[in-house]
Amino acid sequence: FDPRRYDLAKVGRYKFNKKLHFNKRIVGHKLSQDVVDTTTGEILAEAETLVTRELADTLQNSAVPYVWIQGEEREIKVLSSLMVDIRHYLPELEDPKSLGVTELVYYPVLEKILEENDTFEDRCEAIKRDIHDLIPKHITKEDILASINYNMHLEYGLGNDDDIDHLGNRRIRAVGE
């Protein structure tokens, strides 16, 4: 794997996070099955629950890999890209920017850091050391699956089409890009 070949730079990661934001994709829909936290086994939300913004944030930050929601014709499985807010796992962290965290972090790497380090100071050092893995600049497997999932469910009214002719979708390309 060559990370430079699949480098998204800052703009690409921003677009992935914006488009595949798990919580924005499920707000306003009804769950068709219970949502269970994979780490604790706790039921986070029961079936027939209307997903509010607060519940959607909770589900995303709990690193739930998917939820089932009710569509007009059938159940729809919405996949997560497993990007979470670090403050959910380190509530004593006042300013994530002091560690170099400026956006959502990749949960599998964060989980490994939390398991291997016991004290807050050790965890902060590990986060600084592994910041490039926590905030990947390349496409992850979960990104690919969530992208395919997003595109498949456009026909069911989940998500929205991009206007490719919109001037906001233009950018200047640097030399050598």
Regions found by a protein language model. Give the residues of each.
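N-terminal non-catalytic structural scaffold regions of very large proteins
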Residues: 1-177
